[in-house]
Protein backbone atom coordinates (compact mmCIF):
# COMPACT_ATOMS: atom_id res chain seq x y z
CA UNK A 1 0.00 0.00 0.00
CA UNK A 2 1.41 3.35 -1.05
CA UNK A 3 1.38 6.13 1.55
CA UNK A 4 -0.59 9.21 0.60
CA UNK A 5 1.25 12.52 0.61
CA UNK A 6 -0.72 15.26 2.38
CA UNK A 7 1.49 18.17 1.32
CA UNK A 8 5.07 19.08 0.51
CA UNK A 9 6.96 21.62 2.62
CA UNK A 10 10.26 22.89 1.21
CA UNK A 11 10.49 19.83 -1.08
CA UNK A 12 9.88 17.42 1.82
CA UNK A 13 6.79 15.23 1.37
CA UNK A 14 4.51 15.11 4.43
CA UNK A 15 2.67 11.78 4.51
CA UNK A 16 -0.74 11.11 6.03
CA UNK A 17 -0.62 9.27 9.35
CA UNK A 18 -3.84 9.21 11.35
CA UNK A 19 -5.89 7.07 13.70
CA UNK A 20 -9.36 6.34 12.38
CA UNK A 21 -11.31 6.22 15.64
CA UNK A 22 -10.13 8.35 18.54
CA UNK A 23 -11.97 8.11 21.87
CA UNK A 24 -14.49 10.91 22.43
CA UNK A 25 -16.19 12.08 25.62
CA UNK A 26 -19.39 13.92 24.59
CA UNK A 27 -19.76 15.47 28.07
CA UNK A 28 -16.81 17.77 27.18
CA UNK A 29 -18.53 19.29 24.13
CA UNK A 30 -19.75 22.46 25.88
CA UNK A 31 -16.36 22.97 27.56
CA UNK A 32 -14.54 22.66 24.22
CA UNK A 33 -16.91 25.20 22.67
CA UNK A 34 -16.29 27.63 25.56
CA UNK A 35 -12.52 27.20 25.19
CA UNK A 36 -12.73 28.00 21.47
CA UNK A 37 -14.51 31.26 22.29
CA UNK A 38 -12.17 32.25 25.14
CA UNK A 39 -8.79 31.18 23.68
CA UNK A 40 -5.66 32.69 25.20
CA UNK A 41 -3.53 35.11 23.19
CA UNK A 42 -0.97 32.51 22.06
CA UNK A 43 -3.69 30.16 20.82
CA UNK A 44 -5.49 32.96 18.96
CA UNK A 45 -2.28 34.03 17.19
CA UNK A 46 -1.50 30.43 16.22
CA UNK A 47 -5.07 29.84 15.02
CA UNK A 48 -4.97 32.93 12.79
CA UNK A 49 -1.89 31.48 11.09
CA UNK A 50 -3.25 27.97 10.47
CA UNK A 51 -7.03 28.19 10.08
CA UNK A 52 -8.80 27.57 6.78
CA UNK A 53 -5.92 25.36 5.60
CA UNK A 54 -3.73 28.47 5.27
CA UNK A 55 -0.64 26.60 6.52
CA UNK A 56 0.50 24.34 3.66
CA UNK A 57 -3.12 23.29 3.04
CA UNK A 58 -3.19 21.34 6.34
CA UNK A 59 -6.53 21.18 8.17
CA UNK A 60 -6.26 22.02 11.90
CA UNK A 61 -9.02 21.44 14.47
CA UNK A 62 -9.15 23.76 17.47
CA UNK A 63 -10.03 22.56 21.01
CA UNK A 64 -10.53 18.96 19.88
CA UNK A 65 -11.87 16.36 22.32
CA UNK A 66 -9.73 13.23 22.52
CA UNK A 67 -10.89 10.83 25.20
CA UNK A 68 -11.23 12.76 28.46
CA UNK A 69 -9.01 15.61 27.28
CA UNK A 70 -9.41 18.71 25.16
CA UNK A 71 -6.29 19.43 23.11
CA UNK A 72 -5.55 22.91 21.81
CA UNK A 73 -5.03 21.87 18.18
CA UNK A 74 -5.26 18.59 16.31
CA UNK A 75 -4.33 17.61 12.75
CA UNK A 76 -6.26 14.43 11.98
CA UNK A 77 -4.41 13.71 8.73
CA UNK A 78 -1.11 13.60 10.61
CA UNK A 79 -2.25 12.28 14.00
CA UNK A 80 -0.64 15.41 15.44
CA UNK A 81 -1.61 17.13 18.71
CA UNK A 82 -0.36 20.65 19.47
CA UNK A 83 -0.63 22.06 22.98
CA UNK A 84 0.15 25.73 23.52
CA UNK A 85 0.79 26.33 27.20
CA UNK A 86 -0.99 29.28 28.66
CA UNK A 87 -1.47 30.74 32.11
CA UNK A 88 -4.13 28.14 32.98
CA UNK A 89 -1.54 25.36 33.16
CA UNK A 90 0.11 27.12 36.12
CA UNK A 91 -3.00 26.51 38.24
CA UNK A 92 -3.75 22.87 37.44
CA UNK A 93 -2.70 20.03 39.71
Which residues does each predicted region cover?
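Nucleic-acid endo/exonuclease domains
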Residues: 1-93
Amino acid sequence: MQEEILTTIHNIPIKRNFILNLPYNPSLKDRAKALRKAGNFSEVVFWKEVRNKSFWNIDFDRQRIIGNYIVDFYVKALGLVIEIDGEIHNFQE
